[in-house]
Amino acid sequence: MDQSRVLLWVKAEPFIVGALQVPPPSKFSLHYLRKISTYVQIRATEGAYPRLYWSTWRHIACGKLQLAKDLAWLYFEIFDSLSMKTPEERLEWSEVLSNCMSEEEVEKQRNQLSVDTLQFLLFLYIQQLNKVSLRTSLIGEEWPSPRNKSQSPDLTEKSNCHNKNWNDYSHQAFVYDHLSDLLELLLDPKQLTASFHSTHSSLVSREAVVALSFLIEGTISRARKIYPLHELALWQPLHADSGFSKISKTFSFYKLETWLRSCLTGNPFGTSACLKSGKKLAWAHQVEGTTKRAKIACNTHVAPRMHRLVVMSQVYKQTLAKSSDTLAGAHVKIHRCNESFIYLLSPLRSVTIEKCRNSIFVLGPVGTTLHLHSCDNVKVIAVCHRLSISSTTGCIFHVLTPTRPLILSGNQTVTFAPFHTHYPMLEDHMARTGLATVPNYWDNPMVVCRENSDTRVFQLLPPCEFYVFIIPFEMEGDTTEIPGGLPSVYQKALGQREQKIQIWQKTVKEAHLTKDQRKQFQVLVENKFYEWLINTGHRQQLDSLVPPAAGSKQAAG
């Protein structure tokens, strides 16, 4: 088969979920990663290759790269969360951790974890995606970019937004521009010069090409099936092009790189393709007096399970509520949604909320990462594997999470609070995403960026300000209470408030008011309640629950 009919593309998930949205440690440069690659490959008997154990990575990261132990674990755990584990395996790991009585016991359990060594090296290298380039900053927009100055178009085909994690053009360009470095990182130390470079005669092992399948996949001709890179590279008709030798069982570095470059193309399941030719969803309605129309698109009708995307933008002044197969297992991006109440009550793969204001987001369990960037006055309610935030102001996070929330750069007035709601299918959805109620680190965030070393950037919600959140929709299912319950201090605050209400009701009852007095009192209470609804913004939420006119009803997902 003609090699021009082979199409390769860069996978989205390693970048959407795996690339931490913060400049990487300086020790993750190619120079140090090459040294690590050589170090681990010559220590195969010491838990370093082909599987890298946590204890070995901890030794390398803390002892040689001078990283803090928490940061070393963070990168190790993020990569591990990308691995193909069943929900049952993830729940089993949560149970193991929840039974640990000390940090020493936790560390003992972590020491049993291992990851694919070569893939982990690639994972560390792609952290360079979010490296700050001084040259780009000088010739492009100011960095940091003034938030109120941003007038970038909303989710256009070639989005110029700064979120490279969702930009498949950035993914493709990154791999194409650094392909030689990526291949050299995977070479056997014997194939490198003294300065850690390849030669024209360098050979690439099958294991290295298997590892590169972490980033690249593809298809042949018009076949609908997707293949990992190594299966295509090892396919008999392509040996001459990919440079594979049956005798040495290796690839020619030069031929392999040339073949990869000639076949790399855009991701047919990426954000750009989704926005250009994806299915448009009529989930939102047009609000009177606004010119911008909500844009919601998905590729779930054509994409395989791990490639599903849902992108929504410009939902404005309304309630949008969905529990849909379209959302199940999808990577979701929510962009420029303002003054809205958005409920996505399905098990989700990942969620990114970007440039949203004055809104509430209630999400089904998020199996990997929930990330917020450049949001103001937003409340997020979710069970998620990981929460990370950057450039947020005045946001509140009611979360249940087995990992420490990550506070990245540029945040102000962050509030964390316990998860405080439920819907009938919640526990079923948690089981499907492998999320348990313990351990729960909602109140122990990790400040990742040095500028935020001052812990005052966040606070825990005072119990006196805590209320449970009621999801105002009927669904089938068995969950009838908040999974895992509430922390005792918050449960106590609710009990005290309920007691005050009962005392007040008793006082009114024993006042023996006349009929006219009762009527006057009722009007007074209703007026005060109405004022409270307006002052708190709850009036808008109640109004938005009223279904729109028949002609603009939200479509079923």
Swiss-Prot record:
Entry GO CC: cytoplasm; spindle pole centrosome
Pfam families referenced in this protein's UniProt entry, alphabetically: TBCC
Domain C-CAP/cofactor C-like: 290-435
Chief site of localization: cytoplasm
UniProt entry tagged with the keyword Cytoplasm: yes
SMART domains hit by this protein: CARP
One example of a Gene Ontology biological process annotation: regulation of cell migration
Alphabetic keyword roster: Cytoplasm, Cytoskeleton
InterPro entries: C-CAP_CF_C-like (IPR017901), CAP/MinC_C (IPR016098), CAP_C_sf (IPR036223), CARP_motif (IPR006599), TBCC1 (IPR039589), Tubulin-bd_cofactor_C_dom (IPR012945)
SUPFAM superfamilies found in the cross-reference section: C-terminal domain of adenylylcyclase associated protein
Localisation: Cytoplasm, Cytoskeleton, Microtubule organizing center, Centrosome; Cytoplasm, Cytoskeleton, Spindle pole
Family, per entry: Belongs to the TBCC family.
Function text: Plays a role in the regulation of centrosome and Golgi apparatus positioning, with consequences on cell shape and cell migration.
Name listed for the protein in its UniProt record: TBCC domain-containing protein 1
